[in-house]
Amino acid sequence: MSAKWEKTEENTGVLTIEVEADKVNDALDKAFKKVVKKVNVPGFRKGKVPRGLFEKQFGVESLYQDAIDILLPEAYANAVEETGIYPVDRPEIDVESIGKNEPLIVKATVTVKPEVKLGDYKGLEVEVPSTDVTDEDVEAELKKLQEQHAELVVLEEGEIANGDTAVIDFAGYVDGEAFEGGTAENYSLEIGSNSFIPGFEEQLVGLKSGEEKDVEVTFPEEYHAEELAGKPATFKVKVHDIKRKELPELDDEFAKDVNEKVETLDELKNELRSTLEEQKKTASENAVRDSLLEKAAEQAEINVPEAMIETETDRMLQEFGQRLQAQGMNLDMYFQFSGQTEEDMRNQFKEDAEKRVRVNLTLEAIAEAENVEVSEEEIEEEFQKMADMYQRSVEEIKALLAAQGGTDNVKGDLKLRKAIDVLVENSKEVTTES
């Protein structure tokens, strides 16, 4: 087999592949054995038609496509390796010639990974957010804990106020007719949560337990149920109970209830301060890294192929779908409720997808420029970290990752991390207030 690469445009070229005649003949033999099992010829059982008779009746050309399907995957992979190109999309295949006792000649139009001309990636200035934790930060975190451990207590007397939870029955009507999903009993609604149609919750403020009211609202124009969008509606509402948050006292008992490691409120505050310091440190490091990545990518000259942007957009859409599944939802349901289409979402993702691709290409170029190497020991350490994180054996982790590139992917990720380290270690830090 021989292969030749000719660049025709910046990120595109033609890969000419020639496969020897003897391999073509072997592939034609395999193709015949496959096809003859499906052929009906009077006087012969399926699979028993002689080769000569088959070719006379159907022509050897009838075997060409199957022979190409047999030869091309391996030939293309070998040609890519031999020429050292890096395809980023499926090739467009044009079969120049194939025949019995003749070589297979194929021209594949291929989009390849673009060249990257790095700008100045060392000495980049970066603002470092402050990691200081103030007393106000600790008090705010303590207040959150207090809110999280609040109890809802039924009011014996009083009116609904913002922040209360109202237990209600409601029945909705549009044009005097009830509609699907517009009725519920003993529904707990937090006033001010904005979880209902705009204007609904506000009209419950001031009502007492046992009172009833007709709530007049208008469905938003972009409402997911098209038959209701933009229409006025009346909801008949009855209030059963009003529940109000009762905050626990901030004392030593509260501290012990929320954190078994502490005995006093002061100890809890110290724990909160330590946690906040760690969070701010991580956030600061991430902000520095992201800023440097953005600057390095902006200074690099890269003509990103559309195919790479589309692939990254696909990945982002898949990631979003996985996050929805974790919440008991899927993309189809999301599109129905949000009124968006897949095309809308792809368009939203496209700009970020291109940025992601540019950043990764820049990091790969930095790793190459800095001769970054990853040892087998480092790869094994990474597998061990994954095994510890997911509580699986290293062998299980390797088996799970095998279908996704396995060791090569892990090695690639480690190289990118080291390239990020190069950026950070060679940057000029400018400390700012948070």
From Swiss-Prot:
- Gene Ontology biological process terms in this record: 'de novo' cotranslational protein folding; cell division; chaperone-mediated protein folding; protein transport; protein unfolding
Q: Which reaction does it catalyse?
A: [protein]-peptidylproline (omega=180) = [protein]-peptidylproline (omega=0)
Query: Where does this protein reside within or beyond the cell?
Result: Cytoplasm
Show the SUPFAM superfamilies listed in the entry.
Answer: FKBP-like, Triger factor/SurA peptide-binding domain-like, Trigger factor ribosome-binding domain
Annotated protein name in UniProt: Trigger factor
Print the keywords alphabetically: Cell cycle, Cell division, Chaperone, Cytoplasm, Isomerase, Rotamase
GO CC annotation: cytoplasm
Q: What is its EC number?
A: 5.2.1.8
The species this protein belongs to is Shouchella clausii (strain KSM-K16)
